[in-house]
């Protein structure tokens, strides 16, 4: 009878607090991943939905509409972007601040800048807040380790025709509907077909 309450060897019982913290960390990592995917697809509606409704935009403006306009202006100056996030340190708030967290996210970015292809090493300094059970960005500061031009612009390569070919230009992000919507009617640095893909 005395053995009934003993845990199985090698098996740990997880406390509710520990489970909640692990869940919060997983949710915040998904938030960061969604940011990268939405930005690269130019899904600006999805992107701004990752921020708190009263997000501060500049000194005097708040709200997702203003953030949408800010992203649209910034992204109009570049072409294709590829954000690859990696190291992610998360510090959850303590007692009395359970719905707050901060984080540092390391990111390697590839950016089309006209005819140039740029690599950047970035650290995002983030502030997160849980709103109605969902973790969102309060603030995201882009900090740069370096930016360097790569010798060959991959968008100037012939089509890869994947999976037949392993090298060359692929079809992303040009076939993403949100990318096409973002680029419709926009001047491009190169002639494009009706999907926004360079010819």
For every predicted segment, state its role:
Residues 110-119, 147:
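Short, cysteine-centered beta-strand-loop-beta hairpins and adjacent loop/turn segments enriched
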Residues 1-13, 191-199:
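N-terminal amphipathic/basic-hydrophobic helices that include classical n-h-c signal peptides
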Residues 150-199:
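Acidic/histidine-enriched, glycine/proline-rich intrinsically disordered or flexible terminal extensions
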Residues 39, 51, 107-109, 141-144:
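Short beta-strand segments enriched in hydrophobic/aromatic residues
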Residues 5-37, 41, 45, 49-53:
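Short, low-complexity N-terminal intrinsically disordered segments enriched in polar/charged residues
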Residues 12, 100-102, 123-157, 162-167:
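Short beta-strand edge/turn micro-motifs at domain boundaries
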Residues 44-113:
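A solvent-exposed, acidic/Ser-Thr-rich amphipathic alpha-helical stretch
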Residues 83-85, 118-125:
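Short, surface-exposed coil-to-beta transition loops
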